[in-house]
Amino acid sequence: SRDRQPGNGPLVGSRPADRGIATPGAFKRRKSGEDYVIVDGYNVIFAWDTLRELSEHNIDSARGKLMDILSNYQGYMNCHLIVVFDGYKVKDNKGERFPYDDIEVVYTKEGETADAHIEKLTHEIARKHKVTVVTSDGLEQIVTMGQGAIRMSSRDFKAEVERVNEHLRENYLKND
């Protein structure tokens, strides 16, 4: 089992997670998709060097790359994954919500920030499910923790994604 192998990072329920802080390796692979991960899309894009550099040339490409990364992560973790992008500055924007592979993508409506939408989602979902919010926005982390969510910084989430990718390479992509 994954949670007994050395080098996989702390387990769910380790001290940082008990305080509402998720650390890389804190998630263990689930059999059913009862856990939720809500990602502040632009916060992650601008926190990860490769995505930030891509966004400087083409923001659509950076969003697409992030959605591909999140889709792979979701497939391994078997969680409900929602990525939220700000659309609040776009005039007459009614917002949009659509599936992308097995993740859900949300563009907020005019006047609604990603932070506000994430807070609303967290409030609704955290009553019945474990929710991890991925953002490096300090205020957002505090607010969502107050609603029962676990927080994970964008930088720590990058390390978590890299750990998952390494595990996939080691265990599923071997050329026997």
Placement of each model-derived feature along the sequence:
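Nuclease catalytic cores that cleave nucleic-acid phosphodiester bonds
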Residues: 1, 15, 19, 26-39, ...
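Conserved P-loop NTPase mechanochemical-coupling segment
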Residues: 3-14
